[in-house]
A protein has these predicted regions:
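N-terminal small-residue-enriched
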Residues: 1-485
Length: 485
């Protein structure tokens, strides 16, 4: 693989090219799904290709190919330069890159069981056993289970001398149970909605999340929701369990801190950002107990945003995004860091394949834990609603006004959970919501959730992001009904 990168890089005219990098990516994926006791899908995919990014006359050019013959490698390198030249004819200003040190390294994400050492039959058997447990519950109409595994090896070479060989292994799985009664459709998902839990781990993740052992309980909750009362409307204290809070972080913090959105370089997919440059270090984003970091280091955990180096060869870092409630940092690239006067990128550039140019993407955007136990948090809540597991979301194109629907709620009165609620929702304004946070559970309740399907860019790119959170309480939040059924 390294030969292909070296060959492409050698075809560039170093006198003309201000900077260039080459990524050779080899990937392997397996996806298996089941539906009501039958196999839904079993797909495997392998890919090998190369992308060249060149900075010429102050503008980027990018080209890619999966034809790795010498002639094709030369052609793709020249095409990247030609695209940069053409782009320079319409440039407003020259692109400047923040400095970065040369890196030579090899890194493989740790795992205990190579997921690809397991057979399709073994994978299918696990999903079908979980499916059977869920369908054994009277009143369950539909059960869907899924398992995903991916291994990506990337060779990165740059004209600055960096040479990085990086391999990441990701595994994910989940189950969704549905109950239909008349016009009322209720759903419970585990460990999370939208495909479950994904982490930078091997097949050992399946032992940890215990799909088979939990499937029946989740199905029983889906059926029980039909008898639950609708979520009351009004202003209440809201406790969000950690997976829902993870999505809240993703949408109302993660996307608006992407510096390309702030600078107007990205708008088509998910909009721009309310976090204009004047707000950096001047905005009270949340209450004093709200501390949010962007942390791609393995020390933070095996998240989907964990790596050793980003796709510009910048080492993984931890960056304070919100410190004691104050907005303190963006997600940046070498280009955008230089544009706002920062000395260095904080290493967030990633592409979802060899045929896509790197973009600023969330790493692990996490709310740091507090000091509460969940039992104590509930006991100290006189009138509130505990909401679990995302079902829907909506947020405006500047990431400021939002509404989320959840699968299940619990009404809390005088410190006790008194009744199940169905179709709960809550809405608010980003900074008002985070400033209303008055309690966060401790490390024992903290989970690093994986979001495997974050979209950005045109052509569209799908990226996995991580979000660490523990249950937290927010005061005086508008709550109501997400679905009328």
């Amino acid at each position: 693989m390294k030969y292909y990168a070296e060959k492409a890089l050698s075809c560039l005219d170093r006198h003309e090219v201000q900077y260039a990098d080459v990524r050779v990516i080899e990937s392997r994926e397996r996806d298996i799904t089941t539906k009501n006791g039958k196999m839904g899908n079993a797909a495997s995919e392998e890919s090998l290709g190369l992308g060249v990014r060149a900075l010429v006359n102050g503008c980027w050019g990018f080209a890619s190919t999966d034809n790795l013959s010498p002639d094709s490698l030369a052609a793709v390198a020249h095409r990247a330069v030609e695209i940069a030249r053409a782009s320079a004819q319409a440039k407003k200003a020259d692109i400047v890159l923040a400095s970065e040190t040369k890196i030579i390294d090899t890194w493989v994400s740790p795992f205990k069981i190579d997921p690809f050492s397991t057979s399709v039959e073994q994978n299918l058997d696990l999903l079908l056993r979980a499916d059977a447990e869920a369908r054994s519950v009277k009143g369950i109409t539909l059960v869907e289970a899924s398992l995903h595994m991916r291994r990506v090896r990337q060779i990165f070479l740059s004209t600055e001398g960096s040479a990085i060989d990086q391999t990441r292994v990701v595994t994910g799985a989940g189950i969704e149970t549905y109950s239909f009664q008349n016009s009322d459709i209720q759903k419970r998902s585990y460990p999370n909605s939208f495909r479950g839990q994904y982490q930078l781990k091997g097949y050992e993740l399946l032992d940890e999340i215990r799909l088979v052992e939990t499937a029946r309980h989740i199905a029983e909750e889906a059926v029980a929701l039909h008898q639950a009362e609708q979520c009351p409307q009004g202003k209440r204290s809201v406790i969000l369990e950690s997976s829902q809070l993870g999505l809240q972080i993703h949408e109302s913090i993660g996307h608006p801190i992407e510096l390309d959105r702030v600078l107007g370089m990205e708008a088509n997919y998910a909009g721009t950002s309310f976090l204009t440059l004047d707000k950096l270090r001047n905005l009270r984003y949340g209450s004093e107990i709200v501390n949010v970091v962007a942390d791609a280091r393995l020390a933070h955990g095996p998240g989907l945003g964990t790596f050793a180096y980003d796709d510009e060869g910048v080492p993984a870092q931890r960056t304070d995004i919100i410190k004691d409630g104050q907005f303190t940092g963006y997600l940046s690239s070498r280009e955008t860091a230089a544009a706002i006067g920062e000395n260095r990128s904080n290493g967030t550039m990633r592409a979802d394949g060899w045929n896509r140019i790197p973009l600023i993407r969330m790493t692990n955007i996490s709310l740091l834990p507090g000091t509460w136990s969940l039992d104590d948090l509930i006991a100290s809540t006189d009138d509130g609603i505990l909401m679990e597991t995302n079902r829907s979301w909506s947020i405006d194109d500047r990431r400021y006004h939002f509404q989320f629907g959840c699968e299940l709620g619990w009404e809390i009165k005088n410190g006790k959970k008194v009744r199940m609620l169905k179709n709960p929702s809550y809405s608010g304004i980003t900074t008002e919501f985070w400033n209303s946070c008055d309690a966060i559970c401790d490390q024992n309740h903290w989970t690093l959730w994986g979001t495997p399907n974050c979209g950005k860019g045109q052509p569209s790119q799908t990226m996995g992001t991580g979000h660490g959170a523990a249950p937290a309480r927010f005061r005086n939040v508008t709550v109501g009904i997400a679905y009328a059924g």
